[in-house]
Amino acid sequence: MILAFDTYYFENKAKTVCLEFEDWNEDKSFKVHTEIIDSVSEYIPGEFYKRELPCIISLLNQIDLKNIEAIIVDGFVYLDNYKKYGLGGHLYEKLNKEIPIIGVAKTNFASIEKYKKPLLRGNSIKPLYITSIGIDLEEAFQKVESMAGEFRIPTLLKELDRLTKE
């Protein structure tokens, strides 16, 4: 089983959505988990995880974590070449380093070069940035690359983004 998370912020609330699916190339069959949390923390530059991690953990507490192959987050695992944790790294620690985390970021974070890999999909000239922990970066890259969809953002991750804003 694979889990993918995204959170959308509005007013003083956060809507976190998780898609649960079986195969990396899945495009239609998935289960949706959703939660809205009131009174979320303010965004602090460089400390995004402090805002989003509690939302993800709260929703994860409602999901059976047995047989989870990996978790995809919208963001970075590492923030620099010294492996300072981003959202994905902090999530990995919260899960006792038991479930691999793959970060899929839409925008570049310039202070990391060593532990990220740009992925061009479809005809896009703008890459996605892949980072990982608990799984080899090349393997994580290949898994995201194999996800269904002919465009830059894989079909299920596009659907996940849509559901957060619904």
Description of each model-found segment:
Residues 78-95:
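Short Gly/Thr/Asp-enriched flexible loops that form oxyanion-binding sites at enzyme active sites
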Residues 75-78, 105-110:
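Acidic, glycine-rich active-site loops and adjacent beta-strand->loop/helix elements
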Residues 1-11:
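Two-metal-ion RNase H-like nuclease active-site motif
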Residues 3-5, 26, 32-45, 53, ...:
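C-terminal binding/interaction regions
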Residues 15-20:
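Short beta-strand scaffold segments in enzyme catalytic cores
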Residues 1-3, 69-71, 99-103:
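Structural motif
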Residues 52-83:
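Ordered, amphipathic secondary-structure segments that act as subunit-interaction surfaces
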Residues 90-93, 102-107:
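N-terminal nucleophile
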